[in-house]
């Protein structure tokens, strides 16, 4: 049955407009993005197929162009639209961090990190460079590694922070395995970076471990800084 044949109060668009986004299921929200279905399937049916195929919204949004386009009814145009939506979300969160003290919007920092690096299949190390008022100057991917290790050199982090005239930094890296617990190597790296940056009067405010399906783990909250 086409969505236009549904009772008006059950159609995703009408439901969103009258009851808000929280009233919609993942499939209904995705159907609004898809707009149309395909022969024999409504947009909601197609959305359910996509979620079943990828297993979650996170994996769907992290799919490659080839993986996404392999699904019947999808293609490069839809893939480009999805990536544009994701990038708009990242930029909106980055604006919040640019305009205010990051401690006034800690959820924005966490959400930005999850969107940026949470679903990557390889490990990356990011440095968020902050000014004296803890506003974001720039976020930089400094190193990229394998699934199990990445090479992070304190001198490169210090060099970057000085070049951008940063007063403080937030460190972040992802665990593609999905386990957010810090390893002994993670703790050692954090101490090394903090000590190196302290020598040039740059504060390390936090270090986050980011995964796809959980809130980033904060070293500061764990008492590991």
From Swiss-Prot:
GO biological process: proteolysis
Source organism of this protein record: Aromatoleum aromaticum (strain DSM 19018 / LMG 30748 / EbN1)
A molecular function (GO) term: metal ion binding
Residues given in the record as Zn(2+) binding sites: 173, 175, 186
Motif (JAMM motif): 173-186
Protein name per UniProt: UPF0758 protein AZOSEA04420
Pfam family membership, one: UPF0758_N
This protein's record includes keyword Hydrolase: yes
Segments forming domain MPN: 102-225
Domain of life of the organism encoding this protein: Bacteria
InterPro entries associated with the record: MPN (IPR037518), RadC_JAB (IPR025657), RuvA_2-like (IPR010994), UPF0758 (IPR001405), UPF0758_CS (IPR020891), UPF0758_N (IPR046778)
Protein family: Belongs to the UPF0758 family.
Keywords associated with the record: Hydrolase, Metal-binding, Metalloprotease, Protease, Zinc
């Amino acid at each position: 049955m086409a969505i236009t044949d549904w009772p008006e109060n059950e159609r995703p668009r009408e439901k969103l407009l009258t009851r808000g986004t929280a009233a919609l299921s993942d499939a209904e929200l995705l159907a609004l993005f898809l707009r149309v279905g395909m022969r024999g399937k409504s947009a909601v049916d197609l959305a359910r197929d996509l979620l079943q195929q990828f297993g979650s919204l996170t994996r769907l949004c992290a799919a490659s162009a080839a993986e996404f386009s392999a699904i019947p009814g999808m293609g490069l145009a839809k893939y480009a639209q999805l990536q544009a939506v994701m990038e708009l979300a990242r930029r909106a969160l980055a604006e919040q961090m640019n305009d205010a003290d990051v401690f006034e919007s800690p959820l924005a920092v966490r959400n930005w990190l999850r969107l940026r690096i949470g679903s990557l299949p390889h490990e990356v190390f990011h440095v968020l460079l902050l000014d004296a008022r803890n506003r974001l100057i720039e976020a930089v991917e400094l190193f990229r590694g394998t699934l199990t290790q990445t090479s992070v050199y304190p001198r490169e982090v210090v060099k970057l922070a000085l070049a951008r005239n940063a007063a403080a930094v937030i460190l972040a890296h992802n665990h593609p395995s999905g386990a957010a617990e810090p390893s002994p190597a993670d703790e050692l790296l954090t101490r090394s970076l903090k000590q190196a940056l302290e020598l040039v009067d740059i504060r390390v405010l936090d270090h986050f471990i980011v995964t796809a399906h959980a809130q980033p783990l904060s070293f500061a909250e764990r008492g590991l800084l």
